[in-house]
């Protein structure tokens, strides 16, 4: 088979099963409204949960830092790209979340891959929740360690897998809030089981940090859990982009030596780091608390309204509210029907989610108003008839 035939066959297979992904060009996409092709839509696909991407204080911090530092970092943090802005943000994150150290990464995907591939060796085992993010599972597959996956949030299955003999070390991998189902992991029980088997725990709290817990400290803090490795990302609750790994002093020193994504990547712009410090200040403030309260009220309003409809609603109390449709083509048609009525929603299909669980992945943000939720419910009920 030629290279071209391989490419063509893969695309043909995706088209045949209604799983071909596409990008949409938008002129505005992060806030309450999404604008595409000159039309304005209520935006129910953004992960800017607290609406901070449009916050004037954060925008101003980025602008001021860009004037001071320029628009790029100029190198890896090991060469010349570790600025005072990066150092300040790492120290603020570590203090906020109660860890000795924080290390910045350019993305959550890079952070997850860096940590897992740097730590895991040939005789080790990774035990990951079956619904873990693609970055975690891909990193596990790329590492020399054995990968075992436990049934989603099934702690008994997790325990059985950890009990089987392992020559090396074991790492349990889970998420705080799951990106496609919107539900939370039983973190306290998972941590208890991991410690009983002398395993380390890695929690990716991309969708919880900033949004849940005291001062927005996330799902782990809310549940009284302190994993050995906590990954937080900045594209959701923080409204910016990038990520950080929270860990011990020795693990941070180890990652600085062996995490290739950290060593061999140009670091995030200092202006971005300073904007993230400004975002953290908002998250920790009374204003941040008010934004979280408003978001929680909007989620409650949506769930109360949609329960009477014909859609399958998962047990999710986060900003992520998936409506399970099942059939791929039905999910696409439903998303298009909502767009025709001025509501922008995204159809999620395999391989992102398991076969037979295609869905509308609706995300609510603090930027929405109660009338927006009511309009979404009205359109959903009409589209579902």
Swiss-Prot record:
GO terms for molecular function: 8-amino-7-oxononanoate synthase activity; pyridoxal phosphate binding. The keyword Transferase applies. Substrate binds at residues 21, 133, 352. Its EC number is 2.3.1.47. The modification N6-(pyridoxal phosphate)lysine is found at residue 236. The keyword GTP-binding does not apply. Keywords: Biotin biosynthesis, Pyridoxal phosphate, Transferase. It catalyses: 6-carboxyhexanoyl-[ACP] + L-alanine + H(+) = (8S)-8-amino-7-oxononanoate + holo-[ACP] + CO2. Pyridoxal 5'-phosphate binds at residues 108-109, 179, 207, 233. Transmembrane segments: none annotated. Its cofactor is pyridoxal 5'-phosphate. Disulfide bonds: none annotated. Pfam families: Aminotran_1_2 (PF00155). NCBIfam families: bioF. Homodimer. This is 8-amino-7-oxononanoate synthase. It comes from Salmonella schwarzengrund (strain CVM19633). The gene is bioF.
């Amino acid at each position: 088979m030629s290279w071209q035939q391989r490419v063509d066959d893969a695309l043909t297979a995706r088209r045949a099963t209604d799983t071909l992904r596409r990008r949409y060009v938008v002129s505005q996409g992060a806030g309450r409204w999404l604008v595409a092709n000159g039309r304005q839509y209520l935006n129910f696909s953004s992960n800017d949960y607290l609406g901070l991407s449009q916050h004037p204080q954060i925008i101003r911090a980025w602008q001021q830092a860009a004037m001071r530092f320029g628009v790029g970092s100029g190198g890896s943090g090991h060469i010349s790209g570790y600025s005072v802005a990066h150092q300040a943000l790492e120290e603020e994150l570590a203090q906020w979340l109660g860890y000795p150290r924080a290390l910045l990464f350019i993305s959550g995907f890079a952070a997850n891959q860096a940590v897992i591939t740097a730590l895991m060796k040939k005789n080790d085992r990774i035990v990951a929740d079956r619904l873990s993010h693609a970055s975690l599972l891909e990193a596990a597959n790329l590492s020399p360690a054995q990968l075992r996956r436990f049934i989603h949030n099934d702690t008994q299955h997790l325990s059985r897998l950890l009990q089987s003999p392992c020559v090396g070390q074991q790492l349990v991998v889970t998420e705080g809030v799951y990106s496609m189902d919107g539900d939370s992991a039983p973190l306290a029980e998972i941590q208890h089981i991991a410690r009983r088997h002398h395993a380390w725990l890695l929690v990716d709290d991309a969708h919880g940090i900033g949004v849940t817990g005291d001062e927005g400290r996330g799902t782990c803090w809310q549940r009284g859990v302190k994993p050995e490795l906590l990954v937080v990302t900045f594209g959701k609750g923080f409204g910016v982009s990038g990520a950080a790994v929270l860990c011990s002093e020795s693990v941070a020193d180890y990652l600085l030596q062996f995490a290739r994504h950290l060593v061999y990547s140009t670091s995030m712009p200092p202006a971005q780091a300073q904007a993230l410090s400004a975002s953290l200040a908002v998250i920790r403030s009374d204003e941040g608390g008010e934004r979280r309260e408003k978001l929680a009220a909007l989620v409650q309003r949506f769930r109360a309204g949609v329960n009477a409809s014909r859609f399958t609603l998962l047990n999710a109390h986060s900003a992520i509210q998936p409506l399970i449709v099942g059939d791929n083509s039905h999910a696409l048609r439903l998303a298009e029907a909502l767009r025709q009525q001025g509501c922008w929603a995204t159809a999620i299909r395999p391989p992102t989610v398991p076969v037979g669980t295609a869905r509308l992945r609706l995300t609510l943000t603090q930027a929405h108003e109660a009338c927006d939720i009511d309009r979404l419910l009205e359109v959903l009920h009409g589209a579902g008839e």
